[in-house]
Amino acid sequence: MKNTNPNSQPVELNRTSLFLGRLLIFVLGILFSSYIFN
């Protein structure tokens, strides 16, 4: 897999992965806390 646009592609992937990671941790935290307190 060659990088045709090395300037914009990795930044976009980094932002997307960071956003998805935070969102996943946030949702998992809410589900876990609600499961425990329920």
UniProtKB/Swiss-Prot annotation:
Pfam families: PsbL. Its main location: membrane. SUPFAM superfamilies: Photosystem II reaction center protein L, PsbL (SSF161017). Keywords: Membrane, Photosynthesis, Photosystem II, Reaction center, Thylakoid, Transmembrane, Transmembrane helix. It is a single-pass membrane protein. It is found in: Cellular thylakoid membrane. The keyword Protease does not apply. The chain crosses the membrane at residues 17-37. InterPro entries: PSII_PsbL (IPR003372), PSII_PsbL_sf (IPR037266). GO terms for biological process: photosynthesis. One of its GO terms (cellular component) is plasma membrane-derived thylakoid membrane. The keyword Thylakoid applies. Belongs to the PsbL family. One of the components of the core complex of photosystem II (PSII). PSII is a light-driven water:plastoquinone oxidoreductase that uses light energy to abstract electrons from H(2)O, generating O(2) and a proton gradient subsequently used for ATP formation. It consists of a core antenna complex that captures photons, and an electron transfer chain that converts photonic excitation into a charge separation. This subunit is found at the monomer-monomer interface and is required for correct PSII assembly and/or dimerization. NCBIfam families: PRK00753.1. PSII is composed of 1 copy each of membrane proteins PsbA, PsbB, PsbC, PsbD, PsbE, PsbF, PsbH, PsbI, PsbJ, PsbK, PsbL, PsbM, PsbT, PsbX, PsbY, PsbZ, Psb30/Ycf12, peripheral proteins PsbO, CyanoQ (PsbQ), PsbU, PsbV and a large number of cofactors. It forms dimeric complexes. This is Photosystem II reaction center protein L. It comes from Prochlorothrix hollandica. The lineage of its organism: Bacteria, Bacillati, Cyanobacteriota, Cyanophyceae, Prochlorotrichales.
